[in-house]
Curated annotation (Swiss-Prot):
This is Phosphoglucosamine mutase. Binds 1 Mg(2+) ion per subunit. The keyword Repressor does not apply. The modification Phosphoserine is found at S102.
Length: 445
């Protein structure tokens, strides 16, 4: 069954436009509350948010909606998405709710949910909520209305959790870091985590005003961090996005490391301490070089659909621990139940401290394959899936590339486009192959 409101990561949109309006969000919370009460007499829900100005309005709407259904609410204030996931589990709450649109600009916002175990909820739960939304609200009587309170030390509790994921016998003393929180949810906690572990920390992107989240800073705008790291002669820069569930890392030379490289480094660190993973989950976009390197270590790479939700589903299905995306969503399920930019950064820095090597030295054996992406606009009614010329050219190119590259052709989920991606060890070959494939999709002239 198709979901009406939920996307791949909760419900998201422009504030003031359906569905991100206060009246809908109140109805949403009421519907969620009714779903929760089918299995629990008096549920408790935690609500956290990022730093968007609309968070105040949506937080109030959620609180009212839950209370009207007889659900108690605990307000966490500004806190990273993975912090809400952790506290939901630690506080034995029924559900965690995050008000955030992640890496989007401030006019957007969204609502996403975590289970009592701190994991993202499945399609069946979302469909149950959407079904409840179609029903008339049933307000509980006054004696059974929910209550709300604030957990004032939520940031401190999450800081301690993050520190607990770093090896007890190691510190970050002697390391100089620049932390960029994208003027987002981690603006308080991220600098403190690294400082309390011994690092010398300077901060950028840590002065939110409600309107500047992700604006020119953070994981999706790393140029500011590169400039700060090189200017301050820091060892590393750590860039998070607005809700701090993704990571980009910069070294002293200004080199930017993406999620694929950092995932491999986390795997290599486990191997070095005798804890070799059975397998790793990436996505359709994970660079071929990572697959080749992992195979050389006797480790299987399985590709999930793009989206950290699908990486997590594949990890849980196989009972594996490590996975991630090139965008910097990294999962280490023996450390946390969801992607966490701060925890991921600590795993990378732990590998450096334990080995005495830099990130660049630890990744010296990895050279990412050049990747060429061409978007081909489709004409109305064009059937690209049954294009014999495309199928034939794809077979020829895959034979040419062998294990030294790959082809990925997929439709855009939002536009009438086909995305043609080719990876090869040689950039010119990748470009040539991508152009050959794209040409088969061009309309006849």
């Amino acid at each position: 069954m198709t979901r009406k409101y939920f996307g791949t990561d909760g419900i998201r949109g422009t504030v003031g436009q359906s569905p991100i309006t206060p009246d809908f969000v109140l109805r949403l919370a009421h519907a969620v509350g009714r779903v929760l009460k089918k299995s629990e007499a008096r549920p408790t829900v935690l609500i956290g948010k990022d730093t968007r100005i609309s968070g105040y309005m949506l937080e109030s709407a959620l609180e009212s909606g839950f209370n009207s259904a007889g659900v108690d609410v605990v307000l966490l204030g500004p806190l990273p998405t993975p912090g809400v996931a952790y506290l939901t589990r630690a506080q034995r709450a029924s559900l965690g709710v995050v008000i955030s649109a992640s890496h989007n600009a401030y006019p957007d916002n969204g609502i996403k949910f975590f289970s009592a175990q701190g994991t993202k909820l499945d399609d069946a739960w979302e469909l149950a909520v959407e079904a409840a939304l179609e029903e008339a609200p049933v307000w509980v009587d006054s004696a059974n209305l929910g209550k709300a309170r604030r957990l004032n030390d939520a940031p401190g509790r999450y800081i301690e959790f993050c520190k607990s994921t770093f090896a007890n016998d190691l510190t970050l003393r002697g390391m100089k870091l620049v932390v960029d929180a994208a003027h987002g949810a981690a603006y308080q906690v991220a600098p403190n985590v690294f400082h309390e572990l011994g690092a010398e920390v300077s901060s950028i992107g840590c002065a939110p005003d409600g309107l500047n989240i992700n604006k020119g800073f953070g994981a999706t705008h790393p140029a500011a961090l590169v400039e700060a790291v090189t200017a301050q002669k820091a060892d590393y820069g750590i860039a998070l996005d607005g809700d701090a569930d993704r990571l980009q890392l910069v070294d002293a030379s200004g080199r930017l490391f993406n999620g694929d490289e950092l995932l491999y480094l986390m795997v290599a660190e486990r191997i070095a301490r005798g804890d070799k993973p059975a397998g790793v989950v990436g996505t359709l976009m994970t660079n071929k070089a990572i697959e080749v390197a992992l195979r050389g270590q006797g480790i299987e790479l399985v590709r999930a659909k793009v989206g950290d939700r699908y990486v997590l589903e594949e990890l849980e299905k196989r009972g594996w621990l490590l996975g991630g995306e090139g965008s910097g969503h990294l999962l280490a399920l023996d450390r946390h139940t969801t992607g966490d930019g701060i925890v991921s950064a600590l795993q990378v820095l732990q590998a450096c401290v334990r080995s005495g090597k830099t990130v660049a030295q630890l990744l010296a054996e990895i050279t990412l394959f050049p990747q060429v992406l061409i978007n081909v606009r489709l004409t109305p009614g064009q059937d690209w899936k049954n294009n014999d010329a495309l199928a034939g050219e794809t077979r020829r190119i895959e034979a040419e590339l062998g294990d030294s590259g790959r082809v990925l052709i997929r439709a855009s989920g939002t536009e009438p486009l086909v995305r043609v991606m080719v990876e090869a060890r040689d950039a010119k070959q990748a470009q040539s192959c991508a152009q050959r494939l794209a040409a088969t999709l061009e309309p006849a002239r």
